[in-house]
């Protein structure tokens, strides 16, 4: 399955459990993807879905967001799911904006909440 599409997963602290629940509910579909994730988010998803193929990068505030951004810029990420917490101020908010900008510049689909993520993986199922 070397030609699998690559999905990037990121979640703010208050949304990590939501992303893990999303992954568990969609584990069969996600198993068809190569997944990259920021460190803590990837760990949380692996806790509930240990069979998924997830490459864990650095934690978001330590550069994981930038690592995913670099993968987007090199064409190595096909879709981005980023569960954003809009109610909590983030000291690294500029990283979020940078990822959104890269998703737009490189024209990859990006979901910011579960409803959109469900639609994205359903659409990309084939």
UniProtKB/Swiss-Prot annotation:
Question: Catalytic residues per the record?
Answer: 65
Could you list this entry's UniProt keywords, alphabetically sorted.
Lyase
Note the SMART domains from the entry: MGS
Record's Gene Ontology CC terms?
cytosol
Q: Does the keyword Lipid biosynthesis apply?
A: no
Write one Gene Ontology MF term.
methylglyoxal synthase activity
Residues that coordinate or bind substrate: 12, 16, 38-41, 59-60, 92
The answer to whether the entry has keyword Metal-binding is no
Q: Name one GO biological process term.
A: methylglyoxal biosynthetic process
The segment(s) forming the MGS-like domain are 1-126
Q: Which reaction does it catalyse?
A: dihydroxyacetone phosphate = methylglyoxal + phosphate
User: Which EC numbers characterise this protein's activity in its record?
Assistant: 4.2.3.3
Family membership, please give it: Belongs to the methylglyoxal synthase family.
Question: What's the stated role of this polypeptide?
Answer: Catalyzes the formation of methylglyoxal from dihydroxyacetone phosphate.
**What is the name of the protein in this document?**
Methylglyoxal synthase
Give the classification, highest ranks. Bacteria, Pseudomonadati, Pseudomonadota, Alphaproteobacteria, Hyphomicrobiales
């Amino acid at each position: 399955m070397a030609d699998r599409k690559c999905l990037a997963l990121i979640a703010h602290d208050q949304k990590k459990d939501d992303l893990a629940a999303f992954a568990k509910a969609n584990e069969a579909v996600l198993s068809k993807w190569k997944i990259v994730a920021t460190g803590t988010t990837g760990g949380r998803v692996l806790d509930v879905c240990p069979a998924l193929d997830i490459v864990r990068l650095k934690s978001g505030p330590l550069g994981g967001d930038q690592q995913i951004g670099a993968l987007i810029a090199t064409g190595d990420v096909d879709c981005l799911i980023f569960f954003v917490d809009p109610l909590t101020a983030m000291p690294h908010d500029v990283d979020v904006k940078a990822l959104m900008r890269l998703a737009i510049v490189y024209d990859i689909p990006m979901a910011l909440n579960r409803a959109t993520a469900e639609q994205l993986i359903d659409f990309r199922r084939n």
